[in-house]
Amino acid sequence: MNSYFEKELKEIKASIHSLNEVVFEHWVEEGVQTINTGHKIIVSGLGKNVPICEKFVGSMVSVGMDAAFLHTNSAVHGDMGIVKDGDMVIILTKSGETSESIYLARHLKKRRVNIWLLTFEAESTLTREISNCVILKLEDEGDMWNIMPNNSTTINLIILQGLCMQIAKRRGIQIEEFRRNHPGGHIGEVLSNGSWHE
């Protein structure tokens, strides 16, 4: 069993190493600018990427940075009203060919928003239509058929959490912000009695 996990860890590590650091740095800088100018970062996905998006939003707001989740399906049925001029919208799609994501992207391009794509395919409809692309490589999903959204969603989570942490670091967010927003649970107790350690 350990050999399975070791193999998948290698897959995930290799995928993360395929990240273009210059592109990621640009993404972080634009994320900082988005938040600093009073706008928000919206992340959009569907299927198994939904909880990944929600985790990113939860991390962002827990340190006082405005973020929202926009379901790719319901976006074009009225939910796109959450998108305002100046916002950043991150679209998650492994293939870049998901019809719902393409439809959403084309409508977002009519607005004054900063669109980013997080994907695993360098050549796709969306990589051709969206100029800001974070493109990762992935050889194997880790399931029996190499088709289930398994390793790809894990990698999306790692990348988005990294984006959140880097934006927070660049903005100089202090532990007091997290303490104010997270009074509950064991974390809240640890923060309130000062027993946490950097």
Model feature map: region roles:
Residues 1-37:
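An N-terminal, well-structured beta->alpha segment
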Residues 4, 19, 23, 48, ...:
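Catalytic cores of large soluble enzymes that bind and process phosphate-bearing ligands
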Residues 4-5, 24, 56, 69, ...:
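Phenylalanine-focused residue identity feature
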Residues 23, 42, 174-178:
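Secondary-structure transition/capping residues
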Residues 26-29, 51, 182:
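Amphipathic alpha-helical interaction segments
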Residues 39-171:
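Glycine-rich phosphate-binding loops that contact phosphosugars or nucleotide phosphates
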Residues 128, 142, 168-198:
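Internal, active-site/partner-interface "lid" segment
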